[in-house]
């Protein structure tokens, strides 16, 4: 009855059915062929209702929040929409139905006895059959799907029945999954400690969002041309539609370009395009498009039909992984190409409906699985940015969608692409506080102001904390109501206000204690909001560029408390506060490049050299291991060396987790085996395991692999595999996951060869036929470790299952094993000895009292309490089987008494566990006597109340355990009414919330008094040692579970004596079971049960088994019953006796249990596996005595290290210059080169001609300030090599001195520019001297390549560093550079690389001593002092640092330029670096409109005459690859072609601009209008192209080529390729000619078109390859298509023998036999 949690600031992103989507969904069927007779015309009557009615007419509380059964409306749009559409058809109106839908909706409170999952199913089913009624033509297609749906509904009903009864079932009868190993898909999202849990409370606000997200992967767009669908893994990894494939699918009868007269326009549209002659001027400009008729009734923008896709997908090889959202306001834009032809659509209808039916089934299943809990918590933050909610509007019928249904209200401009979209409303506060935060530069994190929830606020005076769609919580903003009302998603704000208003009204009825509890839950909500802005982990990086072209490193951030699917790309300056996480990521990337050692080699080597660990290893840094833990580590190490798989069976609380983690640390650090290791644990202990890994082994790359399918796929993409060709193939060291994920992703995980497998709570493997058992047994593992605190509580068969899992070869035959040890219960000495012998190598078992003497004692008291009168009444009814009274007033599941013992145990706990008692006696929540009724109805609660009051006064903290979840609900309600702060953890609590609850309870200043736990929830790792009192409210059937519960508090770290109070109802079945269990069951549970695998009793020679036979059960039931029936019915006297109980008297009278874990027999059996006996028989006494000196070990390690080759420089050696042999025509010199040449001639005008130095290719001899002495020229050149930036001209001049220092600053800059220009000219003229191009700089030979690279690198470095406020802590290198040979000796890492570059910028390249002495850089102890010689130090000296720094600068250049630095790119490295150097220094050309022109690739020119070719190792070209010469020429030619096309089409620039804008606005316009506009634009452009071709060329062959060049230029303004545009235009022209009855056009007629098609096909067959597919970071899809074109694979091109003989069109038909594919065009 958790009323507080209901009103925590739960995000409302998915709670509301977006009205816009309703309209879109309705449109789907209205526009289908079945409904073409419906008048689809938009008219004012469709929108004449009051816009404010929807929000001002406040329905019953909670109406704005959907019930779970409405989830299907979102996800299965078509079938459900048809249900609502029928009413619309009868009215003859295709307008909105949203308002009436909301008015007619039922109150959102859960109906008594109803199951929301069933409601969901029935609602879906009703809608689905309604679809059949209205769509008779489709009924046959859906029959089979309906049958399947019915079958699935039956299955779901069974599941719901199971769930509805789950709370009543005691813990021992439920599977462990239902307690603490439930997967995240079917868990409650709330923390029970935060309030009541009343299923009938009308104020409960169930959240449907979880069902939406649980289906995020199955809810895939079924339209085959939705480029952003989640179809990567189902369709060969394609992220986008391949347009060339679409060409193959297109039909000559393509309906995409039908005239604008679609039937579904209701006759309101005009018939356009009556004649072929279309005006070149667009009669309706884009600015004149008016969509006012299609406005939403409340003035907000409709969200896009398809949201931004998950950016996390494995894309095609070689593609850069793109951003989810680069622009903070980016919205998805769709192109007209997203629609299929009508013919394709009709053919695919059947498939689409089958797909919908299947998805509907999946949705119902998921809805049925979701636990029905109260008030979903805001911790669940599945972002709709990355876990996309798919609208099923885009089905195969989308061609007929009514225009207006897909439109948005465009208030100002149709191209308003940067609008904000509200994803979540997180909090609210008084207006102005947000501005104050910004003014004072404070954090935007909200604070809890209790006044906000005391009175109903004026929402106009409030501001809201908004999480924007596509952005992280880091970018949340405070916005007022007026700021938000015109934004998409505004309805979420309205629903948030309704929710808060209802909560405020409800708080007025609460007591002060309840309000305090409510405030605590809100503080925890705020904690989670803060958490979501904290960086948990960086999982990827990339290089992007800002608007100025500057390099911006970006990181993919996984946020604290959010899943991998909600990771976002962030700029490095935005997450500067998380520099530690960035450095950890960089360090992980470095470690991946290091290959590990082989297991068998290290095992053999370790046997000979390894000694026992007497001290804790230095790599284990989280604390100090205790002696027995170090002994346990030695046991694990010894077992690994002997290749023995083992069970670590220490008692609860002895630190098995730490010992296991240490073993993996030993493999990674001591043995250099980096994994991969697999650790499988229960969900409840997952967070604790991760925390222990981070604490003890912070250097280990541990992946927590859980979550939804989308999250796990993101994790696989970025965290699993190393795609680089160097290093190990698996990135992570250890993978931490749960049992359920292992089963779900068995196909993925089984492919990995695991070095070590650990299974926590290994009794999950006791059934050798279970799925988990068989799955893990199939995994490829070198060694295994099972971790369990209760290794021998199982039967002989189950013990064999564990041993068989460890060693299938040794323990093959189960029957033989069982036969050998079937008489263990008789304690046959020979059998025990044999068992010890077999198990000794495999088990290590210690108990607390043997090894942990310092742990305070625990005292257990059994408190026997009487039953209350109501309990006695129900106890009698159960014994009498009085169903009439037991089920009085019950509407749901009735008491069946199938298990009468369980029902009696429920009665002993609390009669309110029976619905009839709760309904009849419980009272209303607002009743003042509610607390008294709860307490007095149960004798146990009476004693608990007295006990807790006493413990509260004496400052104790309490753990309360119960088996029954419903009992925990009652206890939670009691604690809330009492005003006691508490936390709660049971099987339905999500993993992250479990950890949060434990952390909150264990916090030093925590005010939590109680912690409610399910007896079995958790396992190893739930450490609540801050509590010193344990209350076992009801004893478990298995005493071992109660012992485990006690160990939650009585464990290492406990400082106080632990008092344990076990409640037992006297004279009841409970007391008798406890007594009999003490006498008969304890030994069996602790040693070996006497049950076989089927759970039946086996025949025994001696003792009976643990199950009770018929006579025993009868005796148990009779116990106390006689006295109960003899008692006089005097309820008042019984009540007085209960109230008069004195707690002190009860405690004195309590039976005290001595602290004996086991008896002597059990001790004897398990004693064989204690510390002293962990070595197996193979070990002799001298194994650990093979002492060798530690120094010798280090020496041996260094001697055995692989002899790595010396690092070769990864940058380009200037001695391998480019071998370009073609000269550029004089007339075709680029304008920037011409300007520079004129500048050079101007500077040289003053000086008489001086002969060039020998071997130089260019000369700088003139300076406006006068002559430069050779000595100063030498110094100037060297100093420029040091600083490289004219911004540091003062430093350069000061260091040079002489004439340069005396010259004015303008002259200094002029000299700097002259040096750079001269080097460029030297490179361009292509000198082939052995040392590369050399410049004659005032008589000083300057290596041009070397200087240009240095200057370019230093300038890039300066620009990058200038972005940071604190460069020393924030600046990092862009990419990883392999460590040098000397790195290991001084501990050099990537941070030192960054500091070295900073020192170079501050002090100059080569000034190593200044860099060393700069204390801020922290390199004093990592660089050798200048006075030390090579043999005197292992630290890097000047040559080492120069080599490292040069390589780093080149790596920075390569990363910033987007070049591939992998080995496969090395073939063209030297040439491309050279070209890049030239182009980087050129100012971007500007075209006539002032826009940035393409980055020109200059054709290198040389002097006339024969060349002296430098002999060098030839670069081998792969087959089909173009030569360097031909490639450069082709690039130049294509660039000139583009300039020419731009000139001749300059008159059509307006049309081209409109075509480009249409790419980004087509999603907002009706499809027919889009097609009409495209047709018009293509007709205008096509006619102009035809005229240009006829004007310029007479040769048909060249006409074809010129036509394609022009269309390729047009394609830079469109999403389609030039070939596709040409094909569409030709088809349009042909159709127009056929309509007019005219023969082939005189302009490029049909014969020419056929020849074009034939020629295109031939060209494509030789050279065309598929376009790369990927998601780019740009805002518009048009830009994406164009950028993707840049990556087109180039086909083979002929070597041009003499470029002077070629015209601008290149060689004619005789020069080449095939059409060369053009290189990619730069974006315009």
Swiss-Prot record:
Stretches with biased composition (Polar residues):
25-34, 362-376, 1658-1667, 1692-1702
Principal cellular location given in the protein's record: nucleus
Extent of motif Nuclear localization signal 2: 1224-1231
Q: Where in the cell is it found?
A: Nucleus
- Give the stretches traversing the membrane: none
**Compositionally skewed regions (Basic and acidic residues) per UniProt:** 126-144, 403-412, 1227-1237, 1504-1520, 1669-1691
Report the top EC class in one word. hydrolase
User: Which residues participate in ATP binding?
Assistant: 650-657
> What superkingdom does the record give?
Eukaryota
The EC code for this enzyme is 3.6.4.-
Occurrences of domain Helicase ATP-binding (ranges)? 637-809
For this chain, the family text in UniProt reads:
Belongs to the SNF2/RAD54 helicase family.
PANTHER family xrefs: CHROMODOMAIN-HELICASE-DNA-BINDING PROTEIN 1 (PTHR45623:SF14), CHROMODOMAIN-HELICASE-DNA-BINDING PROTEIN 3-RELATED-RELATED (PTHR45623)
Protein name stated in the entry: Protein CHROMATIN REMODELING 5
What is the protein's species of origin? Answer: Arabidopsis thaliana
């Amino acid at each position: 009855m958790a009323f507080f949690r209901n009103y925590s600031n739960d995000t409302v992103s998915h709670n509301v059915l977006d009205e816009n989507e309703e309209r879109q969904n309705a449109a789907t069927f209205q526009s289908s062929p079945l409904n073409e007779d419906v008048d689809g015309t938009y008219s004012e009557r469709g929108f004449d209702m009051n816009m404010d009615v929807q929000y001002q007419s406040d329905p019953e509380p909670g109406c704005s929040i959907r019930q779970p059964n409405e989830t299907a409306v979102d996800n299965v749009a078509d079938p459900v929409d048809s249900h609502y559409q029928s009413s619309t058809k009868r009215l003859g109106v295709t307008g909105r139905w949203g308002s009436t839908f909301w008015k007619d909706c039922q109150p959102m409170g859960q109906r008594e006895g109803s199951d929301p999952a069933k409601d969901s199913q029935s609602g879906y089913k009703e809608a689905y059959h309604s679809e059949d009624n209205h769509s008779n033509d489709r009924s046959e297609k859906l029959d089979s799907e309906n049958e399947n749906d019915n079958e699935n509904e039956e299955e779901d009903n069974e599941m719901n029945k199971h769930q509805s009864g789950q709370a009543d079932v005691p813990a021992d009868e439920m599977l462990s999954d239902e307690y603490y190993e439930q997967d995240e898909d079917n868990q409650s999202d709330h923390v029970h400690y935060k309030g009541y849990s009343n299923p009938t409370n009308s104020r409960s606000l169930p959240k449907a969002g979880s069902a939406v997200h649980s289906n995020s992967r199955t809810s895939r767009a079924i339209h085959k041309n939705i480029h952003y669908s989640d179809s990567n893994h189902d369709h060969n990894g394609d992220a986008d539609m391949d347009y060339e494939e679409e060409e193959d699918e297109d039909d000559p009868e393509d309906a995409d370009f039908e005239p604008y007269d679609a039937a579904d326009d209701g006759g309101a549209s005009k018939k356009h395009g009556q004649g072929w002659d279309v005006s070149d001027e667009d009669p309706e400009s884009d600015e004149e498009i008016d969509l006012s008729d299609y406005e939403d009734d409340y003035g907000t923008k409709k969200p896009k039909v398809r949201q931004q896709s998950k950016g996390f997908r494995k894309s095609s090889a070689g593609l850069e992984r793109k951003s989810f959202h680069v622009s903070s306001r980016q919205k998805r834009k769709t192109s007209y190409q997203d629609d299929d032809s009508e013919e394709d659509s009709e053919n695919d209808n059947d498939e689409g409906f089958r797909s919908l039916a299947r998805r509907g089934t999946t949705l119902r299943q998921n809805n049925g699985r979701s636990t029905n809990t109260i008030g979903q918590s805001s911790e669940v933050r599945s972002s709709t940015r990355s876990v996309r909610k798919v609208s099923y509007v885009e089905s195969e019928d989308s061609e007929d969608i009514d225009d207006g249904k897909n439109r948005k209200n465009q208030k100002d401009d149709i191209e308003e692409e940067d609008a904000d979209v509200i994803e979540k409303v997180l909090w609210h506060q008084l207006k102005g506080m947000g501005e104050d935060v910004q003014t004072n530069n404070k954090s935007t994190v909200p604070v809890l102001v209790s006044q906000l929830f005391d009175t109903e606020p004026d929402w106009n005076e409030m501001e809201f904390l908004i999480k924007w769609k596509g952005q992280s919580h880091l970018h949340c903003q405070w916005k007022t109501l007026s700021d938000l009302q015109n934004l998409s998603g505004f309805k979420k704000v309205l629903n948030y206000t309704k929710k808060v208003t209802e909560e405020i009204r409800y708080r007025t009825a609460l007591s002060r204690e309840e309000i305090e509890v409510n405030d605590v839950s809100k503080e925890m909500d705020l904690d989670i909001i803060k958490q979501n802005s904290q960086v948990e982990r960086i999982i990827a990086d990339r290089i992007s560029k800002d608007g100025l072209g500057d390099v911006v490193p970006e990181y993919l951030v996984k946020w604290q408390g959010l899943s991998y699917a909600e990771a976002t790309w962030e700029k490095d300056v935005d997450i500067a506060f998380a520099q530690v996480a960035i450095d950890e990521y960089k360090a992980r990337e470095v470690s991946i490049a290091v290959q590990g050692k082989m297991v068998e080699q290290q095992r053999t080597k370790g046997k000979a050299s390894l000694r026992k660990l007497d001290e804790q290893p230095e790599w284990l840094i989280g604390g100090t291991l205790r002696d027995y833990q170090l002994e346990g580590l030695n046991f694990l190490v010894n077992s690994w060396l002997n290749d023995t798989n083992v069970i670590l069976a220490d008692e609860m609380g002895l630190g098995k987790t730490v010992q296991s983690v240490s073993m993996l640390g030993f493999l990674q650090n001591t043995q250099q085996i980096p994994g991969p290791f697999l650790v499988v644990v229960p969900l409840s202990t997952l967070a604790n395991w991760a925390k222990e890994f981070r604490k003890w082994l912070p250097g280990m790359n541990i992946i927590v692999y859980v979550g939804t399918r989308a999250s796990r796929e993101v994790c696989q993409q970025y965290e699993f595999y190393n795609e680089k060709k160097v290093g190990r193939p698996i990135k992570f060291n250890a993978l931490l996951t749960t049992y359920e994920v292992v089963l779900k992703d068995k196909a993925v995980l089984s492919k990995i060869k695991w070095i070590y497998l650990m299974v926590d709570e290994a009794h999950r493997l006791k059934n050798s036929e279970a799925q988990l058992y068989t799955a893990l047994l199939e995994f490829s593992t070198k060694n295994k470790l099972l971790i369990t605190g209760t290794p021998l509580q199982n039967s002989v068969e189950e013990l064999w299952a564990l041993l068989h899992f460890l060693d299938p070869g040794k323990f093959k035959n189960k029957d033989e094993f069982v036969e050998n040890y079937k008489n263990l219960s008789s304690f046959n000495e020979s059998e025990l000895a044999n068992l010890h012998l077999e198990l000794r190598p495999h088990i290590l078992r210690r108990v607390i009292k043997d090894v942990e003497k310092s742990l305070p004692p625990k005292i257990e008291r059994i408190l026997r309490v009487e039953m209350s009168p109501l309990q006695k009444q129900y106890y009698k009814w159960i014994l009498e089987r009085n169903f009439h009274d037991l089920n009085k007033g019950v509407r749901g599941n009735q008491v069946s008494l199938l298990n009468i013992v369980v029902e009696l145990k429920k009665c002993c706990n609390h009669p309110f566990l029976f619905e009839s008692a709760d309904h009849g006696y419980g009272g209303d929540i607002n009743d003042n006597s509610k607390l008294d009724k709860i307490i007095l109805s149960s004798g146990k609660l009476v004693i608990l109340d007295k006990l807790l009051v006493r413990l509260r006064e004496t400052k104790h903290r309490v753990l309360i355990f119960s088996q029954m979840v419903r009992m925990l609900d009652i206890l939670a309600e009691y604690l809330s009414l009492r005003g006691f702060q508490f936390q709660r953890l049971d099987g339905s609590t999500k993993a992250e919330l479990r950890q949060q609850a434990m952390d909150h309870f264990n916090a030093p200043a925590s005010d939590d008094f109680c912690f409610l736990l399910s007896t079995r929830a958790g396992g190893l790792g739930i450490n609540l040692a801050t509590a010193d009192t344990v209350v076992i409210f009801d004893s478990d059937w298995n005493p071992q579970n109660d012992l485990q519960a006690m160990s939650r508090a009585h464990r290492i770290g406990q400082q106080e004596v632990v008092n344990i109070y076990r409640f037992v109802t006297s004279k009841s079945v409970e007391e008798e079971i406890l007594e009999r269990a003490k006498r008969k069951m304890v030994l069996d549970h602790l040693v070996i049960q006497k049950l076989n695998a089927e759970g039946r009793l086996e025949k025994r020679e001696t003792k009976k088994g643990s199950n009770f036979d018929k006579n025993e059960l009868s005796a148990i039931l009779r116990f106390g019953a006689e006295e109960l029936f003899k008692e006089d019915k005097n309820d008042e006297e019984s009540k007085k006796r209960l109230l008069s109980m004195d707690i002190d008297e009860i405690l004195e009278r309590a039976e005290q249990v001595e602290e004996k874990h086991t008896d002597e027999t059990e001790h004897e059996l398990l004693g064989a596996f204690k510390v002293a006996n962990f070595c197996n028989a193979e070990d002799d006494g001298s194994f650990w005595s093979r002492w060798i000196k530690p120094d010798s070990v280090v020496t041996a390690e260094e001697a055995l290290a692989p002899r790595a080759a010396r690092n070769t420089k990864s940058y380009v050696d200037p001695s391998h210059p480019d071998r370009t042999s073609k000269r550029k025509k004089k007339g075709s010199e680029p304008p920037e080169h011409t300007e520079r040449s004129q500048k050079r001639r101007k500077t040289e005008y003053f000086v008489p001609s001086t002969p060039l130095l020998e071997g130089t290719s260019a000369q700088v001899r003139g300076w406006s300030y006068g002559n430069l002495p050779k000595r100063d020229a030498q110094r100037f050149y060297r100093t420029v090599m040091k600083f490289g930036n004219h911004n540091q001209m003062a430093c350069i001049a000061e260091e040079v001195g002489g004439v340069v220092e005396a010259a004015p600053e303008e002259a200094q800059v002029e000299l700097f520019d002259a040096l750079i220009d001269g080097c460029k000219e030297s490179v361009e003229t292509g000198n082939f001297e052995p040392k590369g191009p050399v410049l004659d700089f005032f008589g000083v030979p300057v290596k041009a390549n070397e200087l240009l690279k240095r200057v370019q690198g230093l300038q890039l470095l300066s620009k990058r560093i200038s972005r940071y406020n604190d460069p020393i802590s924030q600046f990092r290198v862009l990419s990883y550079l392999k460590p040098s040979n000397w790195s290991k000796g001084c501990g050099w890492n990537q941070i030192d690389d960054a500091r070295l570059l900073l020192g170079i910028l501050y002090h100059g390249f080569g000034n190593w001593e200044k860099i060393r002495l700069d204390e801020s850089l922290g390199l004093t102890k990592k660089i050798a002092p200048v006075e030390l010689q090579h043999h005197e130090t292992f630290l890097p000296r000047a040559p080492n640092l120069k080599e490292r720094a040069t390589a780093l600068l080149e790596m920075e250049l390569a990363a910033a330029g987007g070049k591939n630095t992998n080995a496969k790119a090395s073939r063209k490295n030297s040439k491309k670096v050279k070209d890049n150097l030239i182009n980087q220094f050129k100012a971007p050309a500007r075209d006539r409109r002032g826009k940035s022109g393409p980055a020109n690739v200059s054709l290198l020119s040389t002097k006339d005459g024969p060349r002296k070719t430098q002999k060098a190792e030839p670069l081998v070209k792969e087959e089909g690859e173009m030569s360097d010469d031909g490639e450069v020429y082709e690039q130049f030619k294509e660039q000139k072609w583009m300039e020419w096309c731009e000139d001749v089409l300059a008159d059509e620039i307006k049309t081209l601009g409109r075509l480009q804008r249409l790419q980004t606005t087509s999603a907002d316009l009706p499809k027919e209008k889009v097609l009409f506009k495209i047709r018009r634009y293509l007709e205008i452009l096509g006619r102009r192209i035809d005229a240009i071709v006829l004007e310029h060329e007479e040769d048909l062959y060249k006409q074809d080529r010129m036509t394609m060049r022009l269309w390729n230029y047009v394609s830079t303004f469109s999403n389609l390729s030039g070939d596709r545009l040409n094909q569409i235009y030709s088809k349009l022209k042909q159709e127009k000619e056929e309509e007019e009855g005219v023969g082939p056009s005189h302009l490029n007629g049909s014969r020419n078109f056929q020849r074009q098609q034939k020629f295109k096909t031939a060209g494509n067959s030789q050279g065309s390859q598929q376009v790369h597919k990927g998601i780019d970071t740009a805002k518009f899809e048009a830009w994406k298509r164009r950028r993707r074109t840049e990556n087109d694979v180039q086909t083979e091109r002929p070597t041009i023998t003499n470029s002077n003989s070629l015209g601008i069109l290149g060689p004619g038909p005789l020069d080449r036999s095939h059409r060369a594919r053009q290189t990619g065009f730069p974006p315009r």
